């Protein structure tokens, strides 16, 4: 029976009514109030007495009227029965056998249970000469009682109960009461006899077949069971099994294969126990070498170019601390121009970051936290490429002179008026009557050395002449070098100004024309008779345009000189 304090008033009223053999009746008298706040009135009739009470629900009204009835009722109340005492009651609802196993492991003494036969009944003889009333000879059977012997080290305990498990629990309770306050014995080196006794105790719960296999495994001997004979009628079979363990063999007979196998194992086990004991070999202690860390991320430059969120998480993992905690603080701005504020917390450090979306705000918050913790900023890969000067469109060597600080678009070379006039004057001084050379689209992809018919002079002798020609417009040394060939050709009559610039750049030792023309062809830039236009065309369109222009030049050879004068240099 549960504790009466935990019972509800209605339950106690039912017990009171059951004790007096009456039926309690609950009646709903009235229901008032609005729908969200109703009040219910309930009447309780218990015998000739009635009580009324109200509540916000029918159940609460019933409990209130039952509580009122318990306090005002004149009926005698039943005596509460004491709770049943559990013999095996222990804290934690742990069975005594489990608790004893833990204590025995601490003491280093195994707990071994052995069932015992029940005590014999006394020899009782009835008086058969009784002449009186009818003597009933069929007595009710005596309840069966189980007995168990418990051995813990050198201590023995006996338990009894209606079941085998109850007997084990009873013996375990006695052992706990006796051993709980005793000190834990110190482990002492055991001699051969005590070790043998312990082995015998452990082997008491093992079958003979298991013991044979264990001994054979320790001594590295093969084991085989074989049924060599089977005789008798079908309902009374007899089997003979032979067991061979190394050099030992034995036979066993029984009415089943299992029984014959067990008897054969028992016979050969007696022979195996006569063998000398094995030498004790100490097992070597396993030594686990601690692997060194192959990756050391202690460099100050580690993490450059990495995502700040991942970098901060790796830093916390390396510190073996809690991972960063990100919280969205606020969201402000217009619907299409949102601004998110994200906060990150690492230990006692707090940092915030803003961005047009949550991802960027979280990234900025992580970057701010890294700076706050003393780490360098996580620069992006594009910033690193810009710092090192790498560019996918330029594959040649880097120039050794600084770039001019102007706002002119890339790809257009602006000449001063004086230099331009001197270059035009030098073009007019070139002799006419030379053959014109045209470039086919196929020749556009050839190296710059194939565009000139004369042999390219050495850089040491031609570099000063090229520099003088580029700066002053005329150069006697350049004219002397150009007259060495059999048929000197003027620069404008044979090649375009862009090719002249490429030739001069090659003499100076850097590339300027070929790769730059390819780059601006991909971007849609081309040179058209004095005006530079930007198109969104591809490289194929530019090649087609150059091919058509070459065909037009072949059809109108007289316009070449005019085009050469009006053309501008495009890099």
UniProtKB/Swiss-Prot annotation:
It comes from the Eukaryota. Residues 8-75, 95-181, 207-274, 307-375 form the DRBM domain. GO terms for molecular function: double-stranded RNA binding; Hsp70 protein binding; kinesin binding; mitogen-activated protein kinase binding; mRNA binding; ribosome binding. Keywords: Cytoplasm, Endoplasmic reticulum, Microtubule, Nucleus, Phosphoprotein, Repeat, RNA-binding, Transport. Its main location: nucleus. It is found in: Nucleus, Nucleolus; Nucleus; Cytoplasm; Endoplasmic reticulum. A motif (Nuclear localization signal 2) lies at residues 373-412. PROSITE patterns: DS_RBD. Residues 194-203 have a biased composition (Basic and acidic residues). The DRBM 3 domain appears to be the major RNA-binding determinant. This domain also mediates interaction with XPO5 and is required for XPO1/CRM1-independent nuclear export. RNA-binding protein required for the microtubule-dependent transport of neuronal RNA from the cell body to the dendrite. As protein synthesis occurs within the dendrite, the localization of specific mRNAs to dendrites may be a prerequisite for neurite outgrowth and plasticity at sites distant from the cell body. This is Double-stranded RNA-binding protein Staufen homolog 2. The gene is Stau2.
